Amino acid sequence: KLNNVKLKIWQEPWLDFMLCWMIFDAYLTEISNSGIDKKKLMYFYQNRNDFKDRILAKWSSLSGYAARLKELSPIYDMRPGSIETTQIDDENNLEEVFNFVYQIRCNLFHGAKNVKSARDAELVSRGAKFLRTAIDHWMKGE
């Protein structure tokens, strides 16, 4: 039964993205000893860690997902009053790609995604595929 639940989660991009982000966020919290998202991400970018080492070693298998995210760039910060955008200029730049995925996460977690919007659904779906593949590489030690 648990296997069926897992399969259904992976088939639903919105849930898939949230679950993948929670896994990644738990890892960031552990390595950074921080509870602040921006600080966790900066620690991830600026310090050596097994997650980053493994995904950089396999970046060629992730760059297609990153390029697909770049196609939807820029993404707007949907918080009220914000005019900020996040974009990917270089799909091989780990920091740009993860900042873009983080903005998808912020918009999704703060309620500014529309399940009826094809673009929002595509952002979430592509972000989930990228994160899931990165997590798979990390967990398998590839």
Identify the residue ranges that each predicted region occupies.
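Short, hydrophobic/amphipathic alpha-helical patches that form generic packing surfaces
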Residues: 18-29
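Short, solvent-exposed secondary-structure capping/transition elements
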Residues: 28-39, 117-118
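Short, conserved micro-motifs enriched in small and acidic residues
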Residues: 14, 18, 121
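Charged alpha-helical initiation segments
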Residues: 1-14
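Amphipathic, Lys/Arg-enriched alpha-helical patches that create a basic surface
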Residues: 92-107, 119-142
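Flexible secondary-structure boundary motifs
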Residues: 35-95, 103
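Amphipathic, well-ordered alpha-helical segments in soluble domains
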Residues: 1, 19, 101-104
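Histidine-centered active-site/metal-ligand motif
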Residues: 110-111
